[in-house]
Amino acid sequence: MEQNNCKIRTWFAKLALAQKVFLGVIPLFFICFVFVIADIVISLQNKGHIIEEIDKFTNQSNVMLLIYACWYVSKPKSHYLKNQQFFLSAFAYIIFTFLGYNVILAASQQAYSDKDAYSLASSVFLHVLAPIAFLVAGIVKMKTDKDVTFNHFWKSLGYFMIYPLVYGLYLATIPYVRGHYVSDDGKSTTYVVYGEITNTKDNPIVAWPVVICFLFIYFPLSFLAVYALQCKLLNRPLKAQFKCATNKCPK
């Protein structure tokens, strides 16, 4: 037992500061993962399907946080973490989760409308605690992990946009594809992911501009902000990252 404890202490001592911070927030990310799985099970039991849980950007982005944190702590030099692509993308995605729920959905009175304690706790963990924890840990990583390389901006943006574009396509077409379904209150309605602002079928004048603006304005600009923050904290000129055409831009 003492020998095992010694190995753990030695392993912990070798971790970089950012790895230690991410290690500290893994339990929080795991709790959020449990909430996601629990909601999937509850949906399957009560409704016979899980689509309303697995198609939420919130749930997907929170699972992404746990995967990244565990991977970075255990294998920071992994091929899949090279060029900061996973990290920078997850950082920008979780900002959208935080702002999308606490600003946009809150303004339309769709946020924190849960009446039971469990649902409210789930919302707080997934939309507030986990995003803030990842952003704090991420900034520590940006500031202290100097030995990193990342793709030039346009290539990095291209990889980053794959997920939003696929998700946006789903978001815009699911009202047509799934059609009408019976909601929790027993009414037959068009299936949408995030209320009327994403109802491209019945509310196209509002929904289509919202979807298009987020895909082609918000997401590129938000990633630019995250990318610029990384460059600033590493004291690297942002302008050079636009011109560099190699996989690894100069430090």
Curated annotation (Swiss-Prot):
Gene Ontology cellular component annotations, sorted alphabetically: plasma membrane
Keywords, comma-separated and alphabetical: Cell membrane, Membrane, Transmembrane, Transmembrane helix
Topology of this chain in the membrane: Multi-pass membrane protein
Residues annotated as transmembrane: 22-42, 86-106, 120-140, 157-177, 205-225
Compartments it resides in: Cell membrane
Major location category of this protein: membrane
Name of the featured protein: Uncharacterized protein MG452 homolog
Organism: Mycoplasma pneumoniae (strain ATCC 29342 / M129 / Subtype 1) (Mycoplasmoides pneumoniae)
Organism ancestry: Bacteria, Bacillati, Mycoplasmatota, Mycoplasmoidales, Mycoplasmoidaceae
